[in-house]
């Protein structure tokens, strides 16, 4: 039914899953504070285009003589800045102004995609390109540089060493977020805010500070997912609306992993594999069948959500105050 070998399939699944890992880790941190940020797709989009803008103007200024360190750091810093601004905007609307989180998140996604398409289209016009895309192949080479031994250690190198550095950064961040949430006092305070902001406030925890920090840091992590997609997965090529539904997959991954960043590592690879499974179908397979296979991550997420709801185990539930604005005067 499928035509592929596992050694070549897994690296592709990993590369497809890394943006999801960045996005889900950032969203888990955000949701642990009680903020439901459905703007993650837009934030990832802004993170991607911000990195592209920084890289584009650096390549223009350097004139082809790129410094490896700057070629990496400028896009990363621009991506972090762009996604941070999106996170701050979301926090201002939902934490300070107490706007509805669901509506705000959806608006942020629409806004982020619009911003990305505007700047992406503007850069394409600057290049006078005949194709609707921006190619940053020179910068992409630095992001795609693999670990030593990737080409000389056979299947081991292909499975474990053949990825750009951001893939390993994503795994480290996920493990670090898991340790932070479960083994540190600030992590305990953050979870307390997400469970009951009024109780945390009564205990002397600064609810506003934790919500702002968790959401902004989570947004920056998610933004790196957009940068990875462009610079590594897409080989440095930006095309408007090329992200597809990866941002929504990252949100689905949060539910699938039951709000556990460490579980997201393997789950993102699973989702990545399911997402690209359709391309391994026989050539004659109908388009409708391929689209059904692309639905698998969402179907599995719904099944997990149903199972978790039926089990009713407290540790498997979302933060109790998720999506609820905190009104201190009602404490």
Task: Please describe what each predicted stretch is.
Residues 1-23, 36, 50, 59-74:
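Membrane-interfacial amphipathic/re-entrant helices at transmembrane-helix boundaries
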Residues 23, 48-52, 113-117, 167-178, ...:
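Hydrophobic core segments of alpha-helical transmembrane domains in multi-pass membrane transport
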Residues 29, 53, 57, 85-88, ...:
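Membrane-interface helix caps of multi-pass small-molecule transporters
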Residues 64-115, 275:
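Alpha-helical transmembrane segments within multi-pass membrane transporters and channels
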Residues 112-182, 285-293, 319-331:
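Transmembrane helix-bundle core of multi-pass membrane transporters
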Residues 158-237, 261, 266:
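Helix-loop-helix "hairpin" substructures at the membrane interface of multi-pass membrane proteins
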Residues 195-202, 207-209, 281-331:
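Cytosolic-side transmembrane-helix boundaries in multi-pass membrane proteins
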Residues 222, 232-298:
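Transmembrane alpha-helical segments in multi-pass inner-membrane proteins
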């Amino acid at each position: 039914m499928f035509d592929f070998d596992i050694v070549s399939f897994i690296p592709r699944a990993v590369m497809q899953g890394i943006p999801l890992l960045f996005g889900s880790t950032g969203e888990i941190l955000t949701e642990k504070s009680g903020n439901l940020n459905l703007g993650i797709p837009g934030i990832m989009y802004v993170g991607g285009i911000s990195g592209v803008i920084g890289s584009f103007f650096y390549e223009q200024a350097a004139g082809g003589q790129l410094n490896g360190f700057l070629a990496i750091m400028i896009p990363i810093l621009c991506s972090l800045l762009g996604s941070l601004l999106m996170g701050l905007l979301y926090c201002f609307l939902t934490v300070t102004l107490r706007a509805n989180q669901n509506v705000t998140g959806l608006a942020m996604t629409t806004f982020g995609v619009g911003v990305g398409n505007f700047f992406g289209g503007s850069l394409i016009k600057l290049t006078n390109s005949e194709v609707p895309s921006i190619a940053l192949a020179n910068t992409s080479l630095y992001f795609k540089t693999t670990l030593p031994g990737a080409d000389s250690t056979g299947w081991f190198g292909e499975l474990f060493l053949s990825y750009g550095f951001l893939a390993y950064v994503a795994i480290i961040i996920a493990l670090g977020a898991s340790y932070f949430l479960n083994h540190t006092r600030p992590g305990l305070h953050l979870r307390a805010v997400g469970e009951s902001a009024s109780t945390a406030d009564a205990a002397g925890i600064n609810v506003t500070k934790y919500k702002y920090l968790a959401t902004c840091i989570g947004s920056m992590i998610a933004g790196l997912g957009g940068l990875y997609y462009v610079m590594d997965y897409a080989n440095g090529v930006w095309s408007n609306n090329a992200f597809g539904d990866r941002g929504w997959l990252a949100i689905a991954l949060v539910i699938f992993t039951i709000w556990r960043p460490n579980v997201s590592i393997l789950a993102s690879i699973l989702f990545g594999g399911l997402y690209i499974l359709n391309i391994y179908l026989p050539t004659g397979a109908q388009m409708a069948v391929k689209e059904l296979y692309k639905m698998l991550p969402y179907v599995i997420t719904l099944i997990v959500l149903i199972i978790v709801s039926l089990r009713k185990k407290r540790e498997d539930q979302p933060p109790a105050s998720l999506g609820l604005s905190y009104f201190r005067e009602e404490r």
